């Protein structure tokens, strides 16, 4: 019986599990809301349904306002249906107007966040995609001229041409509404120097509501609109001196608390003739508001304003009414005061003027005239071409040889415009920015580059860079500005004439006349220096470097005048001039090992002892040298008038093989002699093996005979390299390893092997290891490579020598390419059934299969045509349950 009950429970489980798929509809209630149809042509401005005109980011909307509980299922325009849905009511709707005529619309359903967009074409409304709606909305915004993008500073609650401001008081709380005007777009909201909100690239601030107590911002509501026309709200509250975002519920609950809460303050008296700086904040005057601002520190509040013994203002109820800011205009002449109060609606502002030494009540019109008068006095202009220091501080500066000017306004002055002739570079736009500094770069007597620094009310600077192209100024980026600065600095540098250029054009001998040149301290006129520059000045500059290169004078070369008395009158050192051209060729002998044993080497004209001889002009081989300077040893050179203009004078200093490092001739003698000794000893100690017969492509050359492949004039080694390798050069003759390209050992070679200077032989010697070509290595199979133990090598007697295998460059290249080939072979394509696919790459043809080796063990191939699709695991669940039930019933029976 127990088994039957268990079976019954199992059978009843399946309908219960399937019940999850059923949708249980709620029981309809008897109180059904009526379906409402709304006509957008209705002129109703209040009630359960009406349209509220809204202007956001330059586009005008008609926003549908409905009371809770009203369900709108149809929106029409007269007899034309815009939207209709019998099942789901709308949540919100807005009509976009163009020239006061409906143009587009969007509808948002109650339970669907996706918007539905409509476009009016003629007399019909048709749905359109979101992209098309946004594109047309962007066209409407582009038709409106955008005058400025600005940041809203809530601490400056004054009228501005960029936004409208409406304020109202309730108890001690002041509510201010800021709305940007048409053409001006607000992107950021901040208070003093604290940033509160910054809109995204596709968002704009349409309105801001702030709640203040005095000048302290406590609560904030920011209205934001995006590209789709959707409005959102951002709420912020002052918590621990920081503006933290809060929810809409917190915002609504905080407003009554602010109105009912009366923050206690301490009454204080303000004496404008003697201000107590401890209890008040002081604000500077600006062009927009040219008044000196006085603000009491928290928690104090001004209840009485006096000027010495004269009382200007006194609160009637000090516990409730007070002044939270005083602005003082023009202390010297016809002063005026503006008091910002927290009471006495609707103005909340009082004005006072000083007439004939007595303070009297004034009006806002008088204050406006006073502000205009002060603005005219503060305003000044900046002409980048003619800078006046009357109202500006002009400081000339230099960067290298580049001249530029830093211009700042003097105290109580403001630059309102920067221009160049009739072209305006910058002008004052309003409260948000003012010019603090200007850098003007001048080239060739005219301004070329201008850098303007505009300071905003927040701690941030806006830099404007402009460059003059032709007759107009163009605004550039900071990177381009940096590049222009570098160009101007490079252009302004005074480039000194090159020494080589002077030497090539003006290379002469000693000065004319028997008188020695004057010393460094002797003053002479500029005309005399120009006359003697060709004969005396230029050789002096090159005399010092020549002495330094010869190793005889170690002092650094200085000005030309300092070398006049020390170089030019000394005629005994003039024969040293040609030594410089021959010194680079002395290392020719170490380059070739053949020449050290020549008996003519000690008397060769390239001998290191040559600098001591003064009979150089008598040498017969001297005129043959193409780089030999003949002019320095000519005794007629000092009196030759054409010698400085000779074009052949720069040959010796411009020799490309001239040593760049000073070199001592005595040191070269010692090193050269030591090299000869080492080479002679090497020749005597080395025992050469018998020369075996070679093939036709290799010809042996005796040591003493020159070869056709080895030229007589071998390129010399530079002295700098020769000096660097002084400790290694003598050992390289003994330890120089001459091997084949395979890196295998070879028989001893003579030091002057002609293989250095002759082309490589095409054949191989029996005693040399056979080097296979790279193509032969690639043709070997994998089995041949693995079974090869080494290569065949024969010694000088012809006996085969078995050596261990070492990987040469060819072997590494061959193995790498074999591995790459094997990787291509192992590429197997598998189909859905797990078998190899029948493609040509996986199963190559007969010819292709013979040339490659499959590294993978073969397995039986299954035909892809006969394969059946596998059943999913869920298909076996009914079979398993059926088997389980059958077995259970059988067990019970």
From Swiss-Prot:
Residue spans of biased composition, Acidic residues class: 831-841
Basic residues biased stretches: 851-869
Disordered: region residues: 492-666, 681-799, 818-873
Propeptide: 874-893
Keyword Mitochondrion recorded: no
A GO cellular component annotation in the UniProt record: plasma membrane
Keywords: Cell membrane, Glycoprotein, GPI-anchor, Lipoprotein, Membrane, Repeat, Signal, Sporozoite
Top-level division of the source organism's lineage: Eukaryota
Signal peptide coordinates: 1-19
Membrane topology, record value: Lipid-anchor; GPI-anchor
Name of the protein this chain belongs to: 104 kDa microneme/rhoptry antigen
